[in-house]
Amino acid sequence: MSGKHVAVLMGGFSSERPVSLSSGAACADALEAEGYRVSRVDVGRDVAAVLADLRPDIVFNALHGPFGEDGTIQGILEYLEIPYTHSGVLASALAMDKAQAKHVAKAAGIPVADALIMDRREFGNAHPMKPPYVVKPVREGSSFGVVIVKEDQSHPPQVITSSEWRYGDRVMVERYIAGRELTCGVMGDVALGVTEIIPQGHAFYDYDSKYVKGGSAHVIPAQISPNIYQKIQSLAVKAHQAIGCRGVSRSDFRFDDRGEGELIWLEINTQPGMTPTSLVPEMAQHAGLQFGEFLRWMVEDASCLR
């Protein structure tokens, strides 16, 4: 029995609050089963005062989205000098900003798709690049706000300039990469297995594919050639290190095996989902680590100055 006091941060106030509550509850239950003393913290604006009162030995960060994975909560934890899981201030901020993460990845020699950054309000009737392309909010996760513009669309979808848009004005317009959706977790500086994600009844791995039961199938190990499998693992570690990640991360890729075999890195996630059936815990289990053991590793890896 560990006896350490772990505060599990969950919820928060981003659009990914429901996802975070699910991750946090699963982690808290598993950590209690591992012998830790756990405090469940539904994060509000007073989180610094709450943590100062709780005085935990370690914070397990199960937050998703802005505030929880953009360097903000990490900065608060550094100020409070409480060791925490996952990446630190700089890596979290870089990874949350898809445009900046892409610049860093490209500079490290990681293959990325052509893209441009623009204000979504500048979209008119003309396409900013030749379709097909993908429009992504620069600072959102869980595929919130992602729009695929197909070849047969004569002008950009109106939803992008709509007053109902809730995902920020800065967007990335990225060349659409056909092919298979592949992802690889990294634990420390070691690649886990490669998983293929097959959305069920969805055009891509959107919110419902990720979080609705039966929304997607996960195939691990991915049924791809050994050299592509190993290349994905190598690129995932390279991205993890280039961006400065700590603990665990997950890199997403597209692989077009129908043509020239183009393999493209899409993005890195410093706060991947943490339920037992989430992608990275599945990868850890494939490597021989049960969910509780995996979380124990993350807690023991926690530190400040990450």
UniProtKB/Swiss-Prot annotation:
Which positions in this protein are listed as binding Mg(2+) 1?
252, 267
**Alphabetically, which GO biological process terms does the record hold?**
cell wall organization; peptidoglycan biosynthetic process; regulation of cell shape
What pathway is it annotated to?
Answer: Cell wall biogenesis; peptidoglycan biosynthesis
A Pfam family (short name) is: Dala_Dala_lig_C
Subcellular location field: Cytoplasm
Which keywords describe this protein according to UniProt?
A: ATP-binding, Cell shape, Cell wall biogenesis/degradation, Cytoplasm, Ligase, Magnesium, Manganese, Metal-binding, Nucleotide-binding, Peptidoglycan synthesis
Picking any one GO molecular function of the record gives: metal ion binding
Name the GO cellular-component terms.
cytoplasm
Q: Which InterPro entries match?
A: ATP-grasp (IPR011761), ATP_grasp_subdomain_1 (IPR013815), D-Ala_lig_Van_CS (IPR000291), D_ala_D_ala (IPR005905), Dala_Dala_lig_C (IPR011095), Dala_Dala_lig_N (IPR011127), PreATP-grasp_dom_sf (IPR016185)
What parts of the sequence cross the membrane?
Answer: none
Looking at its record, which EC class is this enzyme? Answer: ligase
ATP-grasp domain residues: 102-300
Name of the protein in its database record: D-alanine--D-alanine ligase
Q: Which organism is it from?
A: Sinorhizobium fredii (strain NBRC 101917 / NGR234)
| Gene behind the chain | ddl
